Structure formats: structure tokens, C-alpha cells
Amino acid sequence: MSRLLTLAIVFVGIVPAFAADLAFKDQELATKLTVGYAVRLLDMNGDRRLDIAVVDSDRILWLENPNWTEHVISQGQTKKDNVCFAPHDINGDGRVDFAVGADWRPSDTKTGGTIQWITGGKNPAEPWSLHPIGEHPVVHRMNFADLDRDGKQELIVSPLMGRGTTRPNFSETGTPLLVFPIPADPVRGPWEPQVICDDVHVTHNFQVTDINGDEQPEILLVSFEGVSLLEREPAGTWRRTLIGTGNQQTSPNKGASEIKRGRLAGGGDYIATIEPWHGHQVVVYTRPAAERPKLSKPGEQGDWLWTRHVLDEDLKWGHAVWCANLDGDDDEELVIGVRDNASETSKCGVRIYDPQDAAQGKWSRQLVDPGSVAVEDLAAGDLNGDGQIDLVAVGRATHNVKIYWNGAK
């Protein structure tokens, strides 16, 4: 079923002109989820169309474009719950594989948390085989990137908390950010992890990006401490710089939760977060006018604080962030997924923020289909080849998958 959505539009700050409307048509797919923990858009079968891959609590599945036929490629192979995955050709056979994080038990920081990878055959619709990588309690997020610029991608894994930490502050040990180089034989292994950062706490997500424009990958990491930038030094060590304080006024949850970097017109950029952890604020950081402070020696820590703008506080449990050019202008809109209803007038769902004067914190806000998806995760991509970026949201309490077809011209 699909329908044309009327968007509720409000403005954050004072904007000089009315922002162009974004028209979306929603389509709820037949697939029903237990919890849609994660979603990715990628071509699973080589037909040059983006399919929808989803992590469900006990399944990994993909929905085939254009009819969204459901293919379950893993069920019951991992310890419940599956919580994250990352696509990459791990074994070099030219077909996509997935690293998978499972045995999700957020209240247990001492045991559990499995890391594995699954691989399929020539027919990606048939069940895939599973191979272990390692374990760490509270495995939560993962992705692939070539961090050392050797032409090979590494698996980056972020647990949510440090091993053996306890509520409410989870402060006994830091949360390690783990990097697994792919071994020569990824089936037999061993997969040997490297720790590149372990002095932050409760790291809910990260993004690999090139924030310095030097064609070197950096990592943006959100935690109780706020927003950190991790940069690889020539010796191979990593330096952490605090660039955003997060929300330090709330307790025990504090800092920042989700993160994405977006593009502004004129070559600028912004960093978007949810604050505090599992929080009620949509926040954007813009680059400061002053030059970045220079450090005198390798490994030295220092702050490079960006300007913090709170765009929205009328939400409960923001849980997904994406940046995409939805209207064909020169900047990327900020897309936020809200997981819970705060009130009858402030519901879960997808929200879009369009920069009007980002440096001054002026953005327009559009509410898309309020109350329809308790958004656990979302992704953006052109699903029908019309040149417009569409949105896909997966739900927790709503157990659903919805496409928002972009009708912008």
C-alpha cells in the first residue's frame, strides 16, 4: 500500500525564505520484523538496482527490488539478537558478504557478543554459510574501511560499553574501538583485533570519513564524552581530538548517540548527532571560524571544538541519522529517525531538516508520516533509478519496513 504524504513543516530558528517542499509517497512492505536493528541499500544480485538488506533479531534478509521479494539468508545461525552488519567482499570471490554482530545483551557487559561473517554462493537468495571472527561483550556497530590505505578494507567494530562496566556511568574501563584486518584465509583465520581507541565510554556509533580533505580516512566517534575525531598518525597510532562536547547536562545518559557528516553548499560541511545518549535533541556542529589549534608533537591530545546548534528537542529516543541530497540543491539534508512517541503531538517517525543558514543554526524541519515507523534505523538511496534519493526506514515497536519514494523535482 502506498499513499502521498502531506508533510508538516515548521522552522528551526528564523529562516529568510520558505523552504521547498519535499513530496514523498510511502509504501509499507509485506515483510514483518521482530526488531529491524539495521538496514543497508545495496545491489545483492547484480541487476544494478539497490535492494534492501535488513538485520532482524534472528534473521538476516534482503528484499529484492522491484517487487521486494523476501530472501532470508541467515536464520538461527547466530545467538539472538542480531544487532548489526556490514557488507564487503570478504573472501574475494566478487560477491558481497556480511560481517554480523550478534548475541546482543545490553545488560551484560561481561559475556556474550559474537562477531562472525556470512557468505553465499552464486544464488544470493539461498541460505548462506557462517564463519566466526571473535567475541566481545555488547558488540553494537560495525563497518568496513581501508584505514591504513593499503588497498584492503578492515572490519571496524564498536562495542557499546567497556568490558565489565556497570550502570549508571559504565566508567570502570573504556570502550575499545576494534579493527580486524581480514586474514589471508578468512574462513580459518585467525582474525586478530587491534584497539585504536579505548579512552571513551558508551560509544553508540561511528562514521569513517575524510574530514581533513587529505584523502586519508578519519573516524567520527560519539560517546559519553561527546564527539571525537580519530586520526591515524604516520607511526600507525591514532590520536583522538574532541570536536563536540555533546550534552553534558543530563545524567546518567550524556554526550552523543548517533552521528553522520553532511555537505553544505559552497564546500562546507556539518556533523549531525542525536544527544545525549538515546536522547531528545537533534544537534548539528559547524566548523569554527578560527583555525584548528596546532599540536607540538605526535600523540598529543587537544580539543578542536566546533559550534554546537540544537535544532530540535521535541522528540523521544532519536535513533537514526542520515545525510543526503533530497531536493537536488547544493547541500545535503539531514534525515532523523525517531524511535518512540513523546506525546500525541510528537510522534516517532522520519524527520527532515534542510539547512537555510547552517552557521547560524537555521534549518527548516519537515515531519514525514508521523507515528508510522518506530525508527530503529534508516538508509537513503535511489531505488527506482529516477535520480531522486529515496528513504527506507525499519521499525522496532512497529515491526515494519517502509519506503518513502522521493517526488522532488
Language-model-detected regions and their locations in the chain:
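Bacterial N-terminal signal peptides
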Residues: 6-16
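Beta-propeller-forming repeat regions
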Residues: 18-409
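N-terminal secretory signal peptides that target proteins for export/translocation
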Residues: 1-2
